[in-house]
Design a protein with these regions (language model features):
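Short, strongly hydrophobic transmembrane alpha-helices
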Residues: 20-48
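N-terminal Sec/SRP start-transfer signal
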Residues: 1-31
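Hydrophobic, regular-secondary-structure patches
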Residues: 43-115, 122-125, 215-218, 236-240, ...
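Hydrophobic secondary-structure segments that place a key small or acidic residue at a functional site
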Residues: 98-99, 109-217
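"Rare, low-scoring activations can occur
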Residues: 187-190, 200-265
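Single conserved hydrophobic/aromatic residue that forms the stacking wall/gate
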Residues: 269-278
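Membrane-interface segments of envelope glycosyltransferases acting on lipid-linked substrates or membrane lipids
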Residues: 4-5, 85, 205, 214
């Protein structure tokens, strides 16, 4: 015990005689511990932020597709599959395939490249950005195959110089086919598009339209698809919706257990806390 006290006295004497070095040592220890705490806190915050962003971008989305690399694959999807899922699976907000087309658009403010995405009304829910003016296209619009579209705020400004564009028209040309498009809705810009514009990126018109328009007016094949999306009411239902929809599809196509139909629940892509070794 006496020896321990002797060690303590020597330590205290060394601290007193080397105050500067002792303070720096203590400061280094404090900074080191604080840095570890900060890194852990930032890691947790970034992980949470990334997960929130993923939830916002793909919350509730489930992709169904076929493995096209397999020679024995016989499955394709059509409108009857989409209707069956909406009619028979609970907690489904929307079902839609997607077709994309690149072309040119001409409005009062000039000519631009345009990226057009066609789908069913459920296409609205594949993006988290809200409709800020007008409305999204409805099933009636799809049944009519009308020349209607929803564009982004930046696209509206590029084409017309304003976001007050509901009812206005512009010309869009795809593969030599020109159609007059009527704007019925405006969607809020994505963060990535705003960053691109701020950085001087090329202005591209972004539009969404009924799939039937692309088939009837642009002559795209809209009868069969190799992939489509199901959007659940909430990401909490994704697992159940995905399994129920897969069971339904396999039964409809007679391929149960053959792994011809694949799925990926985009809401289940999360950054987890690293596993610690014990």
């Amino acid at each position: 015990m006496a020896q321990i006290w002797e060690y303590i006295k020597i330590a205290l004497m060394n601290i007193k005689s080397n105050k500067g070095r002792s303070v720096l040592t203590m400061l280094g220890i404090i900074i080191g511990i604080a840095s570890v705490i900060m890194v852990i806190a930032i890691g947790n915050g970034v992980r949470g932020q990334v997960n929130d962003e993923l939830e916002g971008l793909a919350g509730g989305q489930i992709a169904f597709y076929v493995d096209s690399t397999r020679k024995e694959t016989t499955v394709t999807f059509d409108q009857t599959d989409f209707d069956a899922i909406e009619a028979n699976i609970a907690h489904v907000k929307g079902v839609t395939p997607q077709l994309s087309a690149w072309g040119t658009a001409e409005g009062p403010k000039g000519n631009f490249d345009i990226s057009m995405t066609g789908g069913d009304p459920g296409l609205q829910y594949t993006s988290s950005e809200p409709i800020v003016k007008g409305r999204y296209f409805s099933q009636d619009d799809c049944d009519a195959g009308g020349n209607v579209c929803v564009i982004t705020e930046s696209s509206a400004v590029s084409l017309f110089g304003t976001t007050d564009v509901i009812g206005l028209t512009f010309e869009a040309t795809f593969w030599g086919v020109t159609q007059e498009m009527r704007v019925i809705g405006v969607r809020k810009d994505t963060a990535s598009s705003l960053i691109s514009m701020a950085g001087g990126g090329t202005e591209i018109i972004t539009a969404e339209c009924p799939l039937s328009f692309m088939g009837n007016k642009l002559y795209y094949d809209i009868d069969d698809f190799s992939e489509f999306y199901v959007i659940a009411d909430n990401s909490a239902y994704c697992t159940q919706v995905a399994q129920d929809a897969l069971n339904l599809l396999e039964a409809r196509h007679g391929v149960r257990g053959e792994n011809q139909i694949m799925m990926q629940s985009l809401s289940l892509i999360h950054i987890s806390e690293p596993t610690r070794r014990t």
